[in-house]
Amino acid sequence: MAPIVPVASVAPVHLSGPKRSSRSVYILLIPGLAWLAVFFLIPLFTLFMTSLQKESASKPGTYVFGIQLSNYANALAEYWPQFLRSFVYAGLATILALAIAYPLAYFIAFKAGSWRSLMLVLVVAPAFASFLLRTYAWKTILADDGVVTSTLNSLHLLPDGRILNTGIAVVAGLTYNFLPFMILPLFASLDRIDYRLIEAGSDLYASPAKVFWRVTWPLSMPGIVAGTLLTFIPAAGDFINAELLGSAKDRMIGNVIQTNFIEFRDYPTASALSFALMAAILILVFGYIRRSGTEDLV
């Protein structure tokens, strides 16, 4: 009978390296999560609780905690025209921004050559000026005695004889102020397209229009979706353009929220309008992303 040879015991392997590494990742997340909680989640929760408050019976003008869901119904019933106007203006500004930005982004990506860097700097340059200052500049440009209005009046293109204090001025201001947010995502998306694919379409005797709609446009869809979202979302909640470039009948929901917060101090109504606007935008955004077939963006 052969002798039994004892098998040497194998020391257990400790995977301290990967565990320690994953633990370090979670530790690094703490500052970001703390910042998100303090400056986003807690204020958001506070705003939501404020939207449910009711007016104190003993002290008119002050509000106490309560579950007052009628705040939402009353706010929407009173201010639905401003809601609708905000989405219409934001939608028009987004469409105009896309129509202006796409050819420019295409030119920078494929045709600019050595001028590419300079053109990108010029696209970003307006952002170095204050948003408020840029809007005031448009107020001067579109003034009744300005060159733009005088020229259009001489051509009989303005039925009201003016641009300032109209919805046209508000949409123009929104388009201009948020145009860089449309150009940059489009450029990034177009710049990733292999130009040989476009050349291949031409080699297969496809017309330029067919190459664009079958090749370039689908491949640039992530940039289109990102650009339209980055333009539409802030435009829908904007109040500066309507305040400076529009009239009382051109007020957007952002103006109503500002007025209720600062002037009327009707905090429940203002908070309810803010949450309703947020919910409406989220519904539109998710529907738009699903319809465009770019669910991977979320």
Segments and roles (model prediction):
Residues 2-46, 107, 117:
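N-terminal signal-anchor/first transmembrane alpha helix
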Residues 25-29, 103-141, 198-199, 212-213, ...:
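Cytoplasmic-entry segments and transmembrane alpha-helices of multi-pass inner-membrane transporters
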Residues 59-62, 239-265:
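Glycine-rich helix-loop "coupling/hinge" segments at transmembrane-helix boundaries
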Residues 62, 135-175, 209, 245-249:
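Membrane-interfacial helix termini and adjacent extracytoplasmic/periplasmic loops
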Residues 77-110:
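Transmembrane alpha-helix signature in integral membrane proteins
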